[in-house]
Design a protein with these regions (language model features):
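A short, N-terminal "cap"/entry segment at the start of jelly-roll beta-barrel domains
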Residues: 1-28, 39, 111-166, 178, ...
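Short acidic-glycine-tyrosine-enriched beta hairpin
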Residues: 64-78, 203-219
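Residue-level detection of beta-strand-connecting loop/turn positions
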Residues: 13, 63, 151, 202-204
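Asparagine-centered strand-capping/turn motif at beta-strand->loop junctions
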Residues: 84-87, 226-227
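Glycine- and acidic-residue-biased ligand/ion/polar-headgroup-sensing regions
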Residues: 45-57, 184-196
């Protein structure tokens, strides 16, 4: 059973919500006003990622420890030893990505043991890959720029087989792709600023997504989007697994897992 949309904790001190729970992708929202974090660990089978939305967190990658504030994306590949810690009682919040999901949502709810969810705590230091293999960047300012025009900007933040993560900016009235589907991966969006107008499902039903809104199209679900304005819009886009999305952004003639909506 999928835990998409379920809330584990919601109190003044903390909130933990499962935004998506799929075999290829788990996304959670976590907010905290208390200190603490998990111990050092690694994942052998999946990628772990963090999008800091509010406040500041200390992240350890290997033997490096740095404070990362709102607007930072971290993507941590398999076998990089890591942990995070909220060091203050001021509010912080982040999105946490697991790709593939490895039953992480059930682990949060206490239904799956850590090892069965690919969470290896106190790992042998010699097993760890170099911290330099992780990605840490300011998602509105850094990354691989593949499009930068007055009407839109697209940056690739991470390009791994398990996950492609991008940051995009559209001005008002900018159109996205027409109605389409993906057959072998899911496509998801988290709105940062402004609004996007999505068309979803067989009837391309229109939905307005404002800041903080999460939208996910599983395989074979028709979707399209545009910015109807009045303001500029920015968002994060997740493709899991990546299925060639980054290569398509670099070369629009590249054939990848995207198809026109069925008639």
């Amino acid at each position: 059973m999928s835990r998409t949309g379920q809330t584990l904790v919601d109190m003044p001190e903390a909130t933990v919500k499962v935004l998506a729970d799929f075999p290829d992708f788990v996304l959670t929202y976590m907010r905290s006003r208390s200190e603490g974090g998990p111990g050092r660990h690694l994942h052998r089978q999946h990628v772990d990622g963090f999008i800091v939305l509010e406040g500041e967190y200390a992240f350890e990658l290997g033997d490096q420890r740095n404070a990362e504030s709102a607007g930072t994306a971290l993507v941590i590949p398999q076998r990089v030893i890591h942990r995070y810690e909220h060091e203050t009682t001021e509010q912080g919040a982040f999105l946490n990505i697991h790709a593939p999901g490895c039953d992480f949502a059930n682990y949060l709810f206490g239904e799956t043991p850590p090892g069965d969810a690919d969470n290896i705590f106190e790992p042998p230091e010699e097993e760890g890959r170099p911290a330099s293999e992780a990605t840490v960047l300011r998602f509105a300012e850094e990354g691989e720029v593949v499009t930068d025009r007055s009407e839109r900007t697209i940056r690739i933040l991470a390009d791994l087989p398990e996950l492609c993560l991008t940051w995009t900016r559209y001005v008002a009235d900018e159109e996205g792709p027409g109605p389409h589907i993906h057959k072998e991966h899911l496509d998801a969006f988290f709105i940062l600023t402004g609004e996007l107008n999505f068309g979803l499902g067989p009837e391309v039903e229109r939905v307005t997504a404002r800041p903080g809104t999460f939208v996910l199209a599983p395989p074979d679900v028709i979707h399209t989007f545009r910015n109807d304005g009045p303001a500029e819009a920015t968002w994060l886009n997740f493709h899991a697994p990546s299925k060639g999305f980054a290569d398509f952004l670099r070369d629009n003639d590249f054939v990848w897992d995207s198809f026109d909506a069925p008639a």
